[in-house]
Amino acid sequence: MAKLSVYLPPFAGDYTGACAALFGMDCLVIIVDASCCTRNYVEYDETRWRGRRKSTFSAQLRTLDAVLGDDARLIDQTLEAARELQPRCIAIVGTPVPAITGMDVAGIAYEVEAASGIPAIGVDTTGFETYERGASRVLCLLADRFAGGEAGDMPHGVFGEAAVSANASVAPSASVDGGSHAHGDAQPSALPRVNVLGATVQDFGTVEALRWLEDVVRIEGVDLAWSTAGDFTPDDVARAATARESIVVSQAGLAAARLLEQRFGVPMRVGVPAAASPAQPRDFDGLVDARPLLIVHDQVIACSLRNELRAAGFAAPLAVASFFAMDDELIEPDDFPIVDERTLISFAAEHPRFAWAGDPLLARLPGFAETPHLSLPHEAVSSTLYL
């Protein structure tokens, strides 16, 4: 009962983060569930779905399939969908049922690739972890599979060759903002390229915020190699290995950036560009007033905001807390992970003169509603309630 939530809803699950990280890619996504997890993702956790749907399907897993371990039906259905849609990639995404029954998601992906010739990845999400871990797994799988390689070297199978040739004659798919952010077929750029890793709607909320993030990065005089904020192709992921640097804008991008740094020597910069931050220092005028300020959000986003406040001259104590993963290298002495609601309730009781910035639903917690605060909607916490 330690994880019981009385005041806050369940947070976005790891399979949601995995699907969100794949949204910008021409990827056939199969969520291995009975349909509930898929519905939860498209209706509550993916704000882009309302304006632009993707090839994301439920496996419609039946009880007998799960109990008897009948993978053949799932594989056949996936191959049929791949033959029809001819995607550049296939992802088999796990949920609680395959996790509990021990289904070999990676093995299924291997069989699908062997039969189709289309690169396939198995994402061992379980539904028991939160969104940033699923997104991180996907980005690492993509970086491990494609970075430093060439799309032309991908294996071809029974109908994989037809899929590749069909995609080669099609222009890059439209980006979330109506432009083209898929760089695989674009002309070589004279500008240095950078990677933008970890940008998902669970942290940035809207299509407009993701578009603005990419625009802000381009203002620095660079072009994008692999950006998870817009559309991308396996070719873009391949070019990530030659990028000037990786800009990590959330926890979800840290592991993939470290992989690129260790394997290809691509340096990483952790932090959200100031102009793309969910809030600006002026928004805090009159709020802090020498009070300790608690920022509750994704750790990378919250730390970026803290740095902006310090640069603007805010002298009050600034602490970062998160319900989600926190990296030891970014933690300062007053920062802390939020184990459950009681962590924040205890903090409020111990710090009667504090202010906070975070999702509006935090105002439900005892000690938070009557405290000065700034609203920073976090889609992973409150879905689309405040977007």
Locations of the language-model features?
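An N-terminal assembly and electron-transfer interface module characteristic of large anaerobic redox
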Residues: 1-387
